[in-house]
Amino acid sequence: MSLTQPKSPAPAGIFRAALLAVGCLLAVSCKAAEAPEPASGADLGCGPQVCAEGAALRDAYAGPVEAWPAVETTNDTPFEEMALLDRPLAAEATPMARLGEALFFDPILSASGQIACASCHHPDLAFTDGIRSSVGHDRQQGRRNAPTLLDKADQPVFMWDGAAMSLEHQAMMPISNPIEMAETQAALIETLNTDPDYAKRFQQVTGEDTVAMADVTAALAAYERTLTRRTKFDLFLEGDRDRFTDQELFGLHLYRTKARCMTCHSGSRLTDDEFHNIGLTYYGRKYEDFGRYALTEEPDAVGEFKTPSLRHVRRTGPYMHNGLFPSLRGIVNLYNAGGARPRPRPGMENDPLFPETSELLPKLNLTSDERDALVAYLETL
């Protein structure tokens, strides 16, 4: 069947029944979000020195966060201290969120009737899709990696380039994107208004006789604000200090000190919500992506991308805006080297748009064991 085949009313009942069956299975996955994610494991590859370093830090990290060893950032960059997230109510708590959950898993939002929000943001994959870049309408492949939707309730800006300023705005963009769901707002609203089930549910929630696009995005955003999962890191912050292995504890210490991770990844969501160039523009080459420059047209924005949250990072690979990094160890190696530092090729020496890697990325000189410890800690997040 072609992905562009028009929606047919004939098999709608059969398709909706199948969808409900899938929804029941997905509901089990969503319920799992209420429990902590599985532990990351034991001290794999933890050498005697690293384990000893971690054991020696037990007392230093036994007290409240404000009593932990001082944070070190590049150029004394301001940061927010680590903290627990404000947990949102479950989707079952509000009718709007329940309606948004139904829409999220329903391919009725797409032109082909075959692509749902969950196609690229699956609960079993930490609300990502686990591939380099997502595949959308008519098997088209996008340029960017699908970010997780977990813990987005308080996020101020969305998309790798900051194109969306709210969850509602973010929810609308994939629907109308010709590469993703390829549906027009007019066609979608007509479909929902003529669907007896959705027409009734929207009327019950909004009190209006007709569905508007703002109602659709409000429902999706309401559901997405409920998406969260507790992790091993949360349990540690809550006071279970024995939850971390010695290697993970040493990794936490490195994250806050020698590795300078808190320069950009701090606060309860472990991000500064800013835009930085870490050297992955691929200027003039395959995978070229100008990042935020496409929105601002400011030369300094070439190659800048939003700092992603590191929460749930163990389960959200492959990594970076283009999904070209399959492992956390590769990411740590990149930052250990001070980021990528591409040089202009002949003819590009005076190009005003040639991107410059951020000065916030010094070489770190982490040993192999230290990098292993840092990865072990990242896997607790």
Where are the regions that the model predicts?
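Bacterial N-terminal signal peptides
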Residues: 16-27
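Residue-level detector of intrinsically disordered/flexible regions characterized by low predicted structural confidence
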Residues: 7-9, 18, 33
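Periplasmic c-type cytochrome electron-transfer domains
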Residues: 2-5, 30-381
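N-terminal secretory signal peptides that target proteins for export/translocation
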Residues: 1-13
